[in-house]
């Protein structure tokens, strides 16, 4: 039998009149309900009354069309559950006793047509009882839908027959396993986190679906289908039932308001709607937080609580459905045992009787081999011990000893801290950490809430110390292996962003928090000083590496003075790599890794007493390049004509591998009449390195950037050099977001880039207008005010041009086109893309700018205009 029928147009006057009357009544009912909800915010009333209004409309349509007496109209899915959100689908089952004849098919088609005419998003199926049972056995979704079936109108006996057969056919244990697998797959789809910046309030972990899964499981097992019933059956405490009801109400309210704000079915809290949604709740922007941040923090707290209680309930239901034949326990101490790999408390009142056991739980979790999680009894005990975790508990010397011991364990720190955060213990011990739980970061490059970012940084730091992960960042792993106290770095990571969102400099405020923590926990002076220094300077190395000229000895010496010694340098380098990697998968790339490693190595040389003045670097670079050339069986003497045209600055700004590569390809093209373009897989490990050698010409840099824009390449770095005889020798690090990172696909386009770019540079056509690239949704929702800063360097020879704006396609070309228009030459370009935000730094020729103040003003104005869209 076909399960879906087409909606046929109604062609009789009585049916048209019926549809018009029912439609008008339903529309009026909806408008009244939406208006009442806007005033009262009682979501339970809204979804129930909206369901009743649709019930009445469907029943009247069913009766008005004189549907068969042996058929039934059944609500299924969420609609069957008895609640309907403003723009949700209305799922119905047209239940028949037998295969329909032609007349019945015609009636059913007219009914479906009327449903659509009523303005309902109808989802319909036509089945007999036997069809339903057969398909439910094959499809867990249909089985779940029938679990919530509710008779709307029609033949009650037929409906009862369906319900009886479905219940008899239902295997609670198999249903539990199927729904658990389905939930895990759904969680994986949403990255297994409730903290996505654009969560789905229905489907994401911690969303409404997680609550529904529990009630489906318990209903299938005959344990109840409401939080009140689960409390009465002993599966929940009264407090847990109240907490679940409260969070369910909030999530439903968010979903209902989201539908109304969007004017359509919308379950994802997209950036575009977060502000309007927050304002519908009455939130307003304050000095430190946007309205959307305040609402989203409330959402994340609710989702976190749902996730926590969901874990407890799932384990409890599993224990009831799958009782273990052997309850073998291993005694750990008088307070804890291991049961089937789970750490379990020996008394329900343990935490109230002995609050020290709260932190001992996580220390044992780290130290005890074979423990893979916390039992339902332990999770419930922690949840119900929240009132014990007060100021007195936080200041207890034994608890401070235990917490520091957790951080000092050689393994298991990441898992322990994540578990402490999931159970809210971490935020109750570190009150300032609690303040950043669920706090969003609208800086366009962090994709995690602050607490999740901090734990991600701790995780990245710990992976440097784990043998199985040494292949990921070998240099970092090498440094970590020789670092005397890795736990110090974990403490610094825990505090580096803890003061976000308070207003003021979070690095300095976080340093105060870290100093207090070190004093309270008896951390020695030397280690405490390092921790606090790391928190205060956790952004310094990234700033220097990505925004300053690392070939400038003054820059390196200044940075070396800040770090002071090798221990501070190594600690800051490891924290910086872990921090940048913990912001977003899009922010870290191999080129940034190379910049940070280069800064580390050259600073280490300075700290070791090595000279980094221009002459010594130039001499060393030439020696290294000659060695590189000989390794390639290339006679260094052949490169002398090219080197004669290169000044000291060139050797300072390029490493020996790059100089050797350029020498081998340009030694016989020193006076080439045509552009020479060479490309190779970047030595940094990602993307391409492209070299351009051509007689210098106006607009050259803009022309090259225009080519890369057209090819959708992202420029990471550019070094621009003019030889003594008037040739431009420019090198670029570029990536293509559409290509894989293994180099294979890049290798396929090397010749294409060389040919196309060389041809473009020969054409000498006028610079085309930059494309008006579109901003992403996130950038449109959280725009950055464009900023341009132009200032001379200390010598006055060059100007440093810094720009920040929302990223978009063609932005770099638009910038370089403005520079070309004003005949301002670029010497270096450091292109720093942070997610949806760009922070670019250019070193430009200062000769014309220094002589003409009006040119500076006009240049800044034109650049600001180019950054706007």
From Swiss-Prot:
This is Bifunctional uridylyltransferase/uridylyl-removing enzyme. Modifies, by uridylylation and deuridylylation, the PII regulatory proteins (GlnB and homologs), in response to the nitrogen status of the cell that GlnD senses through the glutamine level. Under low glutamine levels, catalyzes the conversion of the PII proteins and UTP to PII-UMP and PPi, while under higher glutamine levels, GlnD hydrolyzes PII-UMP to PII and UMP (deuridylylation). Thus, controls uridylylation state and activity of the PII proteins, and plays an important role in the regulation of nitrogen assimilation and metabolism. Pfam families: GlnD_UR_UTase, HD, NTP_transf_2. Its cofactor is Mg(2+). Its EC number is 2.7.7.59, 3.1.4.-. Keywords: Hydrolase, Magnesium, Multifunctional enzyme, Nucleotidyltransferase, Repeat, Transferase. Residues 1-331 are annotated as: Uridylyltransferase. Residues 450-572 form the HD domain. GO terms for molecular function: [protein-PII] uridylyltransferase activity; phosphoric diester hydrolase activity. It comes from Cupriavidus pinatubonensis (strain JMP 134 / LMG 1197). HAMAP family: PII_uridylyl_transf. One of its GO terms (biological process) is regulation of nitrogen utilization. It catalyses: [protein-PII]-L-tyrosine + UTP = [protein-PII]-uridylyl-L-tyrosine + diphosphate; [protein-PII]-uridylyl-L-tyrosine + H2O = [protein-PII]-L-tyrosine + UMP + H(+). SUPFAM superfamilies: ACT-like (SSF55021), HD-domain/PDEase-like (SSF109604), Nucleotidyltransferase (SSF81301), Nucleotidyltransferase substrate binding subunit/domain (SSF81593). Belongs to the GlnD family. InterPro entries: ACT-like_dom_sf, ACT_dom, HD/PDEase_dom, HD_domain, NT_sf, PII_UdlTrfase/GS_AdlTrfase, Polymerase_NTP_transf_dom, UTase/UR. Has four distinct domains: an N-terminal nucleotidyltransferase (NT) domain responsible for UTase activity, a central HD domain that encodes UR activity, and two C-terminal ACT domains that seem to have a role in glutamine sensing. Residues 332-688 are annotated as: Uridylyl-removing.
